[in-house]
Amino acid sequence: MVSRFYQIPGTHRPSSAISSSNESSSLLSARRISQTYFNYQATPECQKVSSKYDPDNPNKDKLGTYDGVFVPTALNVLSILMFLRFGFILGQLGIICTIGLLLLSYTINLLTTLSISAISTNGTVRGGGAYYMISRSLGPEFGGSIGLVFFLGQVFNAGMNAVGIIEPLLYNLGYSAQGEPPAALGELLPRGHWHEFTYATVILFLCFSVAFVGSQTVSRAGNILFLVLAASIFSIPLSALIRSPFTEGGISYTGPSWQTFHDNLLPHLTKGAAGSLLKGKETFNDLFGVFFPATAGIFAGAGMSSELRKPSKSIPKGTLWGLLFTFICYAVVVFSMGCSIPRRSLYDEVQIIQTISSVQWVIFMGEMATSLFSIIVGMLGAAYVLEAIAKDNIIPGLEIFAHSPLYSLIFTWILTQLCLFSDVNKIATFITMTFLMTFVVMNLACFLLGISSAPNFRPSFKYFNRYTTAIGALLSVVAMLIVDGISASVLFLAMILLFLFIHYFSPPKSWGDVSQSLIYHQVRKYLLRLRQDNIKYWRPQILLFVDNPRTSWNLIRFCNHLKKGGLYILGHVAVTADFPKQLNELKTQQKAWMKIRDMAAIKAFVQVGTGPSLIWGIRNVFIGSGLGGMKPNITVVGFFDLESYRKHIPQSRSQNNLQKQVEIKATVPRSTCSDVKINVPLPTDECKNETKVNVQQWVQIVEDLSLMQSNIAIAHGFKNLEIPNKRDSCFPKKTIDLYPIQMCGKVEAKGDQPAAITTNFDTYTLILQLAAILVTVPEWKRTHSLRVILFVEQEYHRTNETQRMKKLLQVLRIDAEVLVVSLDQFRVYNTIVKGDPIVFDYVNSKLADNEWWKDLVEARDTLKPKRRFSTIEPQTIAKQFTQSRKYTSGVQKLGVSFTMNTRMPTNRIDTPCESEDSDLDTDLTSIRDAFSASTNISVGKDLTTKSKTGSDRTNLLVKNLQSDVSTQSLRPVFSSNTLPRTRVVEDGTGEQPTLIPIAEPDLSNGNGTGSGIGNGNKLKKPVLPELSPCCSKDSLVTAMQNLGFNDLPSTAQHLVLNDVMTQMSKSSDLIFSTLPVPALGTHEDHDASLQYVEDLDIWLEGLPPCMLINSQTMTVTTAL
């Protein structure tokens, strides 16, 4: 079809010389035929060379598939039991059940052989056969335990053949006993117990000598013995065809007969048959236990793995062909005997096969051939297994067998010699158990490798899958229970004990095992399914930032206890501006911290992060830690090293005005536990030392963690913590004190949204939760108990607060003692709030550079009562009033309102000048009214603390986060409010909080101590606080009644808390309390950052080890 494009006006068709008329033609010229010159068919194929003649094969002189696997497997499976016990088993079970038993046994063998073939073709197989394959697949615990069991099975198999060979030997060459027919071939050997033991010993020693010469000699002997055995088996159906029927000495032979076949078709269990050792009637279980060893020699070829040229090829091929050959032989023998020998003859004669044979000496030679080779292979295979176990050094005490194969062969020979004291049937049952146990574990190994989907499990043998391996393992277990359930249970118990022994006493191995692949598969699967949305299953998942393990050793170990089955990550930051150059250093640090983890014996992951700065490194570690639902929910950071900071910066703001401190009489002494001394070199000693964090960086870390909604824990003084060990016990128990201090405010109404009371109930409960978790750790449970300490400002609140906390602890199922104290019992509080001068010097030294404190002191000095004289001049009164106004305004700017009480104390004697003082009383009343006015200060976004007078004492309106340090230092961070009432959501499921704090009606009182959260309507009206007895009462009452703990600036609050805790927790081992987080942007101002850190330092000074906690998530629930 011709394009219509050229029919548009203004277009023209290009000339034919430039363009082809075919518009769809390719822009490139057609490829010339001559350019395709490579012909793959002409490449000569590499000629296949047998491994026996391959000059590059270092094992070319070793055994191949036929002589190394097929012959040993055939000779070992075609056991002496075929000649000694097939007549007995066929007479009891009949042809159908015997063939069924044969099919069951060979099904187990075939499925196990498929597993052996798969594992052996997945890599290089060295000496040890089944042990080597299992140990490298399932690990040293499984390999060592099953290796010992398999070793004993091989030993008992050799012993069974050594004992079993005596019967045909005496039948053919022994002296005839009285009443018994003469020997078949000649009377040469005397009978008797010790004679028989001597014959077996001599035969065993001859077999040991052949095995001692070497595998090549065993191979040559095996080829000859295999031909003899094949001729012997071939003679059985041949005799059934050519020999005429006869009856001789109670033994009858009918030849091939349908009647005989019909009579022998079904089972007929009897007792007392020849070859039976049971006093009662035979059972299927006992017969299976005797029959199975006749088919269980499939590991004979695999046991020769160290002597094979190419084990991965020879083991599957030789074993499968050996199984097929032996199954045909057994089936032919069963049908030949079943259709030609009457059942009575099968009951009465053990050597019935030789008795009805046309060439009896051939049967005797076959019996000798299979027995001798089974003994040789059994001892040699067992010796190889023992040598392999010894070389792997997984069981202590076997090192001697690793030096020379001769030692393991001699030891195997001695153990086999001990088996000669037992009976064939008993040995056969034990061999069944050991072989079946080996089958179970071999199939299990292949099954686990298959389901683990390990990329490197790619066996060249493809005729297996997870179903064949699972069925093989299951059938093997069922077969064990069929034979003897008690023996199977005992063997399983022995396996478990061996497993545990190897697990705890064997040195670590670098083989790797399938458990790693399975763990990976399951972890990936369940990590994708893991959710953290249900509070019921909350657990601490800790990220601990550590710089130097020497200074944080106790904290590292403490967090390991605190995690209580949760996630634990050791985080470290390496600051680098040039990542490629520092990559090797990062790898070195990663390895070093992993060694630190192992030295500390903690269950933790290691996360080493990097960044151009410490802050970015912290962010990277936090964001990159964990996987899926296993992400850190608590970040632990050590407290800022303020002492080192002051040494390096002596002109810090805090030291410029630092005065001589006056110690309180009852302070907490320093812990008797010295700093942690680690006298051994640590792996991190060789790593690069990071620059010390500065105060602004430390505050920014806390801000960032809060911004990323992480629960934060600040650890202080943990170098003095004495961590209990497993052997410690203590009575009475030591104390862990909990101070769940409230930080609450009020969110102002905005539009349609009503005002709401806010509390730090999440932090409150997390403190209780972590402490409760810690005392469930066995080391802490035996040595420590919990104590919850609360404080209120008024004595009448104590009872109510105690009841609420006990109720909360009962709901949370936490066992702890509850103490509630009143702040007016403590000196620092009385000095700051009530003007008590008892520790004024100490408080003044701590608050010397605090403007709020200066103004308060000056206001109190101005309002200090003076003696009233009737001659007082009005000018003095006016001057005093003016000065009071001035300082009243100064204090008022700080958000503090005072209510002055003009009532005289009742115990004062009235002066005659009372009327003259009326004007002064009026003026002071004016001052009181002025002080009662509330003022605003910028401290937090839309947050206010509400006084109990009903007026807003501090209107917290933040318009700019970057307020100056003087303003920030005035912010109250704690509250003395009583514990909020809580409501339990009874139908909760754990997805949402089931314990909810209730905001109760706000009651006003006249003392301004608290916001009223948690106060019920039933509470009586508060009583005004009494004046300190140290205050002068000569004139007007000058107590500033509305000043309370909630009104104090942060520094003063921290000082009060320090006094409370030093008095209450002087003998405690550990303290948990609330962490006030800095406002966002605090780190941008050095003085504000330093003020925040110094406030915390004032609080924690002289205290036992403390952990300050801030939570942003609910961690407790009452849901089932």
UniProtKB/Swiss-Prot annotation:
Keywords: Calcium, Calcium transport, Ion transport, Membrane, Phosphoprotein, Potassium, Potassium transport, Transmembrane, Transmembrane helix, Transport, Vacuole. GO terms for biological process: calcium ion transport; cell volume homeostasis; chloride ion homeostasis; chloride transmembrane transport; potassium ion homeostasis; vacuolar transmembrane transport. Residues 84-85, 167-193, 243-283, 339-360, 415-430, 483-487 are vacuolar. The chain crosses the membrane at residues 63-83, 86-106, 146-166, 194-214, 222-242, 284-304, 318-338, 361-381, 394-414, 431-451, 463-482, 488-506. It is found in: Vacuole membrane. Disruption phenotype: Affects vacuolar morphology and decreases survival upon hyperosmotic stress. One of its GO terms (cellular component) is vacuolar membrane. GO terms for molecular function: potassium:chloride symporter activity. Pfam families: AA_permease (PF00324), SLC12 (PF03522). InterPro entries: AA-permease/SLC12A_dom (IPR004841), SLC12_C (IPR018491), SLC12A_fam (IPR004842). Residues 1-21 are annotated as: Disordered. It is a multi-pass membrane protein. The modification Phosphoserine is found at S34, S654, S915, S918. Catalyzes the coordinated symport of chloride with potassium ions across the vacuolar membrane. Involved in vacuolar osmoregulation. Belongs to the SLC12A transporter family. This is Vacuolar cation-chloride cotransporter 1. It comes from Saccharomyces cerevisiae (strain ATCC 204508 / S288c) (Baker's yeast).
